[in-house]
């Protein structure tokens, strides 16, 4: 009986250990390989709020520029480029989740008007394929064809991201019209500062959770620090944990206040959003416009010829 209980206890311990190990692997892979698109997709049905704010800004707190370039006008059922630029200093290094320094990744979310979608591979020209490179565009939702995310990808290689877009044809799509449409984009470089559950990453400032005097600063073997704050009473101590990659600004014996920064801000990245407009042009209107321009040019030519003919007649009368 004792042997059976011991076997059951050991089995339970091994199961718990393997479960914890598996969870750590999943979390580690998630945070590295699919951080920002995954967080947005899991937490929000639509990446653009009613206020116009793109939800990526909830985790990436710093504001940085992002630009999008599209043609001014396009014809129905036509493939065109939407070029997203995410500029930053390529020499910068960020704090990684393990506390080490590394290069910045970039990512983007593109919100197209309804009816616009990603161009199928057989419609993409070789020149456009070369601009796209090895990027993989993922639908924000399986049933949504006009919102796409890409990344994280190495920023050293992809500060410019080219999306191949296929315009709708109002003749086949009743929801499409010959109008001016907005295209929204959000792009970030670097890791976020806040996780979806509200907890901080090691890529942001950590503040004191209590006022008092710094009693002790302990450096952990696996990285990070424990800052022990005494609030004035002998028995009440508050421990502030700093994750790996952050260095304390305070020292032992120093008096600090509530919410005082314990670290500097390590973040070198940020998020930004932009909007561009594209006109879905009616081909018949283009033909009418071309005919109008051609008629004006012909009228000008006939006017010049008529003027020269009149001058010849006048010159002949003078000679007579």
UniProtKB/Swiss-Prot annotation:
Keyword Membrane part of the UniProt annotation: yes
Residues that span the membrane, as ranges: 286-306
Any GO BP: photosynthesis
Topological relation to the membrane, as annotated: Single-pass membrane protein
Taxonomic superkingdom: Eukaryota
Cofactor(s) this protein cannot do without: heme
Binding locations of heme: 36, 56, 59-60
GO CC annotation: chloroplast thylakoid membrane
Subcellular localization: Plastid thylakoid membrane
Subunit structure: The 4 large subunits of the cytochrome b6-f complex are cytochrome b6, subunit IV (17 kDa polypeptide, petD), cytochrome f and the Rieske protein, while the 4 small subunits are PetG, PetL, PetM and PetN. The complex functions as a dimer.
Family, per entry: Belongs to the cytochrome f family.
PANTHER family linked to this entry: CYTOCHROME F, PTHR33288
Protein name: Cytochrome f
Species the sequence originates in: Cuscuta gronovii
Lineage: Eukaryota, Viridiplantae, Streptophyta, Embryophyta, Tracheophyta
